[in-house]
């Protein structure tokens, strides 16, 4: 009998490990090869097929324990490095899914190679292992370093930390700090040198947690020693500016509020301080109020469309305003309810002189028969209607004739206007006409007002000029940001009164606010001409080539991203399947990519301007969207009658289609294009050049498919809200996906400090100095980051430590 040589247990274990590694490698290669073949049929890159075949072959050789397995894998890795450099150069985040998996494979292959060679080449293998381990360590460390940073140059700040005389301290009495909407405060007690000493001075909790689609996005205002805030369901709260203690709360008890509850701000009116009140001969005179009663007023609009005035001192309704303190805003609108409100108010009302100027929010994507986008002005003293601007019928200047309504479904103004008291103009950022993604039935008269900036005469409500930012908008490119007013150099030693308008397209338009003519060059460019049946598209669209553009570069297959090469490949396949020919590719019956997406670019947070340096501060969103027009005959409409839609479907009643829409995400639930998905940035309005940029926030608190990241990796996340800038050269911002209030150097963009919040914030911070203690505070509302499961009801004030 022959002796049978028994295989050593150690050898069996090694063979098993080699086999498992080979199987995993072969399966990965098979996936890449099969999916890569599909990509090729769509006109995409050949890399994945070739790399997949190489990995498949190497995996089979590992299973068979052949030394050539390592060599083939090495060739695949060398080719991958060359391909990655050719596609994206040395840009870090695009490199991650291309190279990181191969660094792991390379490390394992180096460690396993001696088992294929019976111990030969052990030294070389371990050297290779060390190299791959070092590269992985360097790469892992680089994950926590901001990339794509453009750093600005320091600017001198004159006499920081000085005490501005109290009579020169302006209250933060408007939503955007001032009528110009610059979100600027001259306060400089908190400086770049001491901002790292900020601590929580007080915290107030409203007791109301926003649920469902509701959000707590409020920016408080401050007048004297009182801070005023409002909750998503329209409660108004007055707080002591030094202690945060509640002075009063007013609950208007709105009815039938089931969705989209928001209150981004309240406004302030003090009749005695109006310098140039408008005189209205056809209105009844203001009632003579009891001395001290409603001498100072808080103006609020509820989610059920009531305009209110409340005594700023007591929190009680001002009985001489409207009907015992309230005006019904649904008058003249026609039908506004169908299970859910089709008309509401989410932004702060605008108080200009002795007027309250209002637009309104309408439910996107529902119908061609939605409430009017009429803009109205009411007497801040009596609540009477002073004028109305009906975009579809200029003949209506107050209430519509009996039995009629304001023109239905005209473009609306749901954001915040700015106003120039000297010019007597109010500037309206308008939305696009309903229903957002199909415009075949839109009247010609109202087309020019869609997604535009419109200047109205403050006294009469008559149009002075209009500038459109997107022609025949069928992409939901509402002008969401409040206009910012600032005087820019004319190059001749003088100044031009400018209006700076951010848009969802990532374009920044700089206009002469007297005439609406561009100051920075704007040109019309040709855009794709295909469109859905019954609709049409404009031949050209306006591009602000005289100002920097953010996040608006056309996407290509190379821009697709993923956490691994698997989901990156799937994103590339999905991208090639989409109907996309660049910006302004019109929605169609195919899946159509919209980029910049309809969240932005720049959304409702708006810009901040340092009035000393002329720096403009912005934050954006870079998330593509996918839409599809579905013929109405192919859809079960019974699901859509409530007006809520099903999932990501809107009914668009009155059109031939319903609309499906969603974010363009990978199978792992992350955006398909490379980071950053949101940035902070600054533009010098004098030179019209970008001066700095940095990714906005980290994934630390992001929840993806139910898993919390918990890693402060600064990918640059989508942003909401806006920034506030101080006279000491600090920009405060909190609208990131992670839970921090940040302080940035306005000149360089460098992060100076960040304070941890209990939940995320979507609101714009504000700052003020207490007239009682002289202490400067920075206040932020933390109600929860967008799409975060963590909700809150916090109003938090930060300040420097009190002096002993």
Regions found by a protein language model. Give the residues of each.
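N-terminal pre-domain segments of enzymes
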Residues: 129, 138-186, 541-566
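Repeat-blade elements of multi-bladed beta-propeller folds
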Residues: 172-176, 213-233, 260-306, 341-368, ...
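Asp/Glu-centered strand-loop micro-motifs enriched in Gly/Pro and often flanked by an aromatic residue
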Residues: 185-195, 200-228, 252-253, 280-288, ...
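Topology signature of small-to-medium multi-pass alpha-helical membrane proteins
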Residues: 2-153
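Short, solvent-exposed loop/turn elements at domain surfaces
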Residues: 179-186, 208-213, 237, 436-437, ...
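Extracytoplasmic/lumenal domain signature
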Residues: 194-207, 236-260, 268-276, 280, ...
